[in-house]
Amino acid sequence: MVNVPKTRRTYCKGKDCRKHTQHKVTQYKAGKASLFAQGKRRYDRKQSGFGGQTKPVFHKKAKTTKKVVLRLECVVCKTKAQLSLKRCKHFELGGDKKQKGQALQF
């Protein structure tokens, strides 16, 4: 279980700052894939009509987890940076701190 606080004081690369400032932490989420990207247009054109599946469908998935990517936004200049963490099964943002002698809860 990885628990990350919602704010973090870290270095800001923005032109205004270039020093340690408070950052707001959120988890990165991939955007919706565009229908008009060149690869998608080519794929849709190839798929249309008769002939079934034209490209291989990937089945041999090897990984069970994804790396967690944090999005850090500077409170002062609003510059955004990304920071990747190690792989983990359980990720929590701004959860309660651990107490000594407590049982683990998921």
Swiss-Prot record:
Keywords: Antibiotic resistance, Cycloheximide resistance, Ribonucleoprotein, Ribosomal protein. This is Large ribosomal subunit protein eL42. InterPro entries: Ribosomal_eL44, Ribosomal_LSU_eL42, Ribosomal_zn-bd. Belongs to the eukaryotic ribosomal protein eL42 family. GO terms for molecular function: structural constituent of ribosome. It comes from the Eukaryota. GO terms for biological process: response to antibiotic; response to cycloheximide; translation. Confers resistance to cycloheximide, an inhibitor of polypeptide elongation. GO terms for cellular component: ribonucleoprotein complex; ribosome. The keyword Iron-sulfur does not apply. The keyword Ribosomal protein applies. It holds the Pfam family Ribosomal_L44. The gene is RPL44. PANTHER family: 60S RIBOSOMAL PROTEIN L36A/L44.
